[in-house]
């Protein structure tokens, strides 16, 4: 596969998309949604191949469930595309405007990024989500999904490209790297003549590889240890419910709770309540002070080196007792708190200290970490959750897939 040819085609498509009207882009999205439903039999047949190969490869049931498409899920994906149609198109909107002393009207106008390369996990719905968001914002995309969803993704991209052609937009607006060869990922990361941004969705290893090898700006996101600190002033019963939601609602999510920090003055009362709530469901990984109050835990082990640096993505929870909010913050700084973190407290000053000190992309007071999500934030779908500080931070919706240009309008004005 020649990635330079792919890149050239994407760049040409991006120039056309940049001037496409919202109506034309929405028309393409509507056709994509309809074609997903019309081609359900072919898509589900391709997905069945992926599922069978996954079983032969020994994938876990949880992983197979992430790969699985059925009629209900496919209809949901189609409706998600229709929801993108209803979102406001940010392209062309003015961020701000002013008239200078020389009479020039100067504004900042939102524009597409250009070509976005996305390397992502083995979830077929992500292929559609990313394509739809990039299309709505006038960006061309080059996609590289997990090898476990190869047949599903090939069929989905075929449907997308057919819909684009029917809408009068270039099929190369959405392209897929067909071969699972890892060397092609390395080549994509060097394609800076054609690709404007790389978004890796996956584990720390993928992010590290992209940062070290890419000559293209990389948005780092998804990975980060999520914490909840239960302060001494917190409502303990309500805090237990929030911790359960953050840990057990969807433990494989990147915004699920990894480490629980508990104020030493309420640990003796709070931790037995937590054990009673989560016993039989969660494995507790504990330091000595916490262990002393968790004697009735059914699944528990002592914390070892690296445990508090682990994004569990499972029914495992690190637990530590701390002296106060400052020690909680210090622990978070030491253990990669960059994604979603929360404090349970009824103390205003402690809440503000936590908000101002936490280095996370999203910080919550008396709320679950599970809210870090484009849909929950009212952004619609998201292309990723950024944990870095440049360009975008937190859930990346439509606006985060744009940049801006300065536009100056005057009456044949020359600089003095």
Curated annotation (Swiss-Prot):
It is found in: Cytoplasm. It is an enzyme of class 1 (oxidoreductase). Its EC number is 1.2.1.41. Disulfide bonds: none annotated. One of its GO terms (cellular component) is cytoplasm. The keyword Metal-binding does not apply. Pathway: Amino-acid biosynthesis; L-proline biosynthesis; L-glutamate 5-semialdehyde from L-glutamate: step 2/2. One of its GO terms (molecular function) is NADP binding. It catalyses: L-glutamate 5-semialdehyde + phosphate + NADP(+) = L-glutamyl 5-phosphate + NADPH + H(+). Keywords: Amino-acid biosynthesis, Cytoplasm, NADP, Oxidoreductase, Proline biosynthesis. One of its GO terms (biological process) is L-proline biosynthetic process. It holds the Pfam family Aldedh. Signal peptide: none annotated. Belongs to the gamma-glutamyl phosphate reductase family. This is Gamma-glutamyl phosphate reductase. It comes from Vibrio vulnificus (strain CMCP6). The gene is proA.
């Amino acid at each position: 596969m020649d990635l330079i040819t792919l890149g050239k085609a994407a760049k040409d498509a991006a120039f056309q998309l940049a001037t496409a009207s919202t109506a034309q882009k929405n028309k393409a999205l509507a056709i994509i949604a309809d074609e997903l439903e019309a081609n359900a039999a072919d898509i589900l047949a391709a997905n069945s191949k992926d599922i069978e190969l996954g079983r032969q490869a020994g994938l876990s049931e949880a992983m197979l469930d992430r790969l699985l498409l059925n009629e209900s899920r496919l209809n949901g994906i189609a409706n998600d595309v229709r929801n993108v149609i209803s979102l406001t198109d940010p392209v062309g909107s003015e961020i701000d405007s002013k008239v200078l002393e020389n009479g020039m009207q100067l504004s900042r106008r939102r524009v597409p990024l250009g070509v976005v390369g996305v390397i992502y996990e083995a979830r077929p719905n992500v292929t559609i989500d990313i394509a739809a968001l990039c299309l709505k914002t006038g960006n061309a995309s080059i996609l590289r999904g997990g090898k476990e969803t190869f047949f599903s993704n090939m069929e989905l991209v075929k449907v997308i490209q057919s819909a684009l052609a029917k809408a009068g937009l270039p099929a190369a607006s959405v392209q897929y790297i067909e071969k699972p060869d890892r060397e092609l990922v390395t080549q994509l990361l060097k394609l800076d003549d054609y690709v404007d941004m790389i978004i890796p969705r996956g584990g720390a290893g993928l992010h590290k590889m992209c940062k070290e090898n890419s000559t293209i700006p990389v948005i780092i996101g998804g990975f980060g240890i999520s914490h909840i600190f239960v302060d001494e002033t917190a409502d303990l019963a309500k805090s237990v419910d929030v911790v359960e939601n953050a840990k057990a609602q969807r433990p494989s999510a990147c915004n699920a709770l990894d480490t629980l920090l508990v104020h030493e003055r309420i640990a003796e009362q709070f931790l037995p309540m937590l054990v009673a709530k989560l016993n039989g469901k969660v494995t507790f990984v504990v330091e000595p002070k916490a262990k002393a109050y968790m004697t009735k835990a059914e699944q528990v082990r002592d914390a070892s080196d690296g445990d508090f640096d682990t994004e569990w993505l499972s029914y495992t929870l690190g637990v530590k007792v701390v002296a106060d909010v400052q020690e909680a913050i210090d622990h978070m700084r030491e253990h990669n708190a960059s994604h979603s973190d929360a404090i349970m407290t009824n103390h205003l000053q402690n809440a503000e200290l936590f908000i101002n000190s936490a280095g996370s992309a999203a910080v919550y007071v008396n709320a679950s970490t599970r809210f870090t999500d484009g849909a929950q934030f009212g952004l619609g779908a998201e292309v990723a959750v950024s944990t870095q500080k440049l360009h975008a931070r937190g859930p990346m919706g439509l606006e985060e897939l744009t940049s801006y240009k300065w536009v100056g309008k005057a009456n044949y004005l020359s600089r003095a």
